Amino acid sequence: RHNEIVHGKTNNFTMFGSITLNKVVGGINPKAVDVALRLGAKVVWLPTQSAKNHMQKMNQDLSQCVEVVKDGKIVPELRSVLELIRDHNAVLGTAHIAPEEIFTVVEAARDMGVKNIVVTHPEWWIVGMSHEDQLRLVKDYDVILERCYAQNMGGGKYKSNLADNLELIKEVGYKNVMVDTDGGQTENPHWELALAEYMQYLVDHGIPEEQVYH
């Protein structure tokens, strides 16, 4: 509807809604997820700034965090959320949770029949997932790895991910990698310019065009 209203269907760009399960929406809140999905949202992100892992890395008050795993198991509310994601054939995004939590959540999601799973910018230092673990997630659970144009290093500084992304794509294969910008910051190019630079970089460094524009 956004494209239809704003652009009058004059382009082929499609925008999908989402919900992020931070403290502001009640954390792991099945009711909020249910409403979002019934309104047309296609992606459910686990906590970002409210994730325990994020708040630990930022030395913030953990009493305000949203936990997704306790004692090695997903919290009961997350099971309800995963059921909704499965039933609506939506996408689960792991957001800013820790690598060990990602494995627990992904395994539970697959066991419950969730088909579409994106591991959110695993290269970012807040998430900090090794290449080996990323490869293992793809091998064991057939997830999609989101790899971003640049990553926030704190203090308004951003680091290019292009070389590292290229290496991973060559290792894991293009079918299990989703590229995006994670842009919108004044320090980075406009998202469409960043994405064009990203695509061209991959082509210039040996990734076939039919894979880049798959």
Walk through the language-model features, giving the residues of each.
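Extended substrate/RNA-proximal surfaces in nucleic-acid metabolism proteins
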Residues: 11-12, 22-120
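Short acidic/histidine-rich active-site segments
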Residues: 174-191
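Divalent metal-coordination and catalytic microenvironments
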Residues: 15, 44, 48, 92, ...
